[in-house]
Amino acid sequence: MDALLQLKGIDKAFPGVKALSGAALNVYPGRVMALVGENGAGKSTMMKVLTGIYTRDAGSLLWLGKETTFNGPKSSQEAGIGIIHQELNLIPQLTIAENIFLGREFVNRFGKIDWKKMYAEADQLLAKLNLRFKSDKLVGELSIGDQQMVEIAKVLSFESKVIIMDEPTDALTDTETDSLFRVIRELKSQGRGIVYISHRMKEIFEICDDVTVFRDGQFIAEREVATLTEDSLIEMMVGRKLEDQYPHLDNAPGEIRLKVDNLCGPGVNDVSFVLRKGEILGISGLMGAGRTELMKVLYGAMPRTSGYVTLDGHEVVTRSPQDGLANGIVYISEDRKRDGLVLGMSVKENMSLTALDYFSRAGGSLKHKDEQQAVGDFIRLFNVKTPSMEQAIGLLSGGNQQKVAIARGLMTRPKVLILDEPTRGVDVGAKKEIYQLINQFKADGLSIILVSSEMPEVLGMSDRIIVMHEGHLSGEFTREQATQEVLMAAAVGKLNRVNQE
């Protein structure tokens, strides 16, 4: 079968790093090609070379059988290559239709925008995705998951021959994911080629026909998905066997460190639980169940309307994140790029940002040597892959960005560490490193709350698990009691089992 798109022998270097070396990718008509690899393997760089954002140093790009070079995203888009980025690229103040057709609005014979036609065309695109809202709605009023579906509708509006999807389900619900897969199958039947970039093994084996593996900027293999298992694919990605993906540390927790009684706030109703020293408490539940809201009320980022929180036996009132930090409660956001990191600043500046008090003299000036020493220690401890601590953090892979975000929280020497979706968008190799770090914190007596949508992660890492449903606590389970079936029953409200100490 002739490829619609073929990249061969692609090299790309940046100062101090060879991002791609002999990389290759084929996209076939009517098939979905998964592109997988650890963060930093070169997947994003390859997409930027393909769409013309980066100029390749060596290699060839064949588009519909002809040697081609794209000058930028616009030329690749006009040629028939569409890309759905992991980061949303929408304007909240405009309607869905205005976002979809921005810069190419329909005009009537008088040169004015034909709003009726534009909304009708946009509504048809939304209907293809089985979405229930209309295109005259403002994008800013949509959930993150619905905004991602608008991004997909926008790319479909170009009638692209090849569509690149970069972690497209990262913010989608199961229903939205099912709708996306239905659309992908429809696109396949029309002879379009899909590049599907994802860390989610289940999705790759469900929707993809072929898979291309990158490792350290190099092409490792192209295989039919049907010939592989999850384990064999992961081993190709990381170059080693993965034993025990969730390395649980079986230490007995200590005395109660945090006690939450009848806590209420936006999206949180009458929640009570305890957390012990050296314990990992998993928080499970469906999207919108109130898990993140509970953590933000606890940390001080959202207002508490009633209830009590005690830390080491003393009542704590957190009216702001600063109060949370001052009391030893650190929250690592689920959205590290929006809430957790300053992408234009360096690794060092991001890591030490909340701990500057520890590196400040009485007059307010910084002890730069102390700061550099501490940052260097964390970079080594966390195995952060960066050319230097002065590197802009936005240039690091997702897994390394997440390590920096966690290190920043630990620099303030907290008593309670809240990790909200700590491995979202992180590859399997970096996940294992993060799990090992979490176990190290646990062994040191740190109390950890692990919020995750990945049930195997919650089940594998937690000592106890509580489940949220519609702002309430719907279940509490020991490690031995917890199964995927039990957690799901509690998450949908079919089971209510809460045993408080």
From Swiss-Prot:
**GO molecular function terms here?**
ABC-type D-ribose transporter activity; ATP binding; ATP hydrolysis activity
Any idea where the ABC transporter domain is? 5-241, 252-495
List, alphabetically, the GO terms of the cellular component aspect.
plasma membrane
Give me the reactions it catalyses.
D-ribose(out) + ATP + H2O = D-ribose(in) + ADP + phosphate + H(+)
**Which residues hold ATP?**
G37, E38, N39, G40, A41, G42, K43, S44
Keywords from UniProt, A to Z, are: ATP-binding, Cell inner membrane, Cell membrane, Membrane, Nucleotide-binding, Repeat, Sugar transport, Translocase, Transport
Please verify whether the record's keywords include ATP-binding.
yes
Q: Does the keyword Repeat apply?
A: yes
EC? 7.5.2.7
Localisation: Cell inner membrane
According to the record's subunit comment, the protein's assembly and interactions are: The complex is composed of an ATP-binding protein (RbsA), two transmembrane proteins (RbsC) and a solute-binding protein (RbsB).
Task: Give the PANTHER family listed for this entry.
Answer: CARBOHYDRATE TRANSPORT ATP-BINDING PROTEIN MG119-RELATED, D-ALLOSE IMPORT ATP-BINDING PROTEIN ALSA-RELATED
Family assignment?
Belongs to the ABC transporter superfamily. Ribose importer (TC 3.A.1.2.1) family.
Which protein is depicted? Ribose import ATP-binding protein RbsA
Instruction: Specify the species.
Output: Salmonella choleraesuis (strain SC-B67)
Gene name?
rbsA
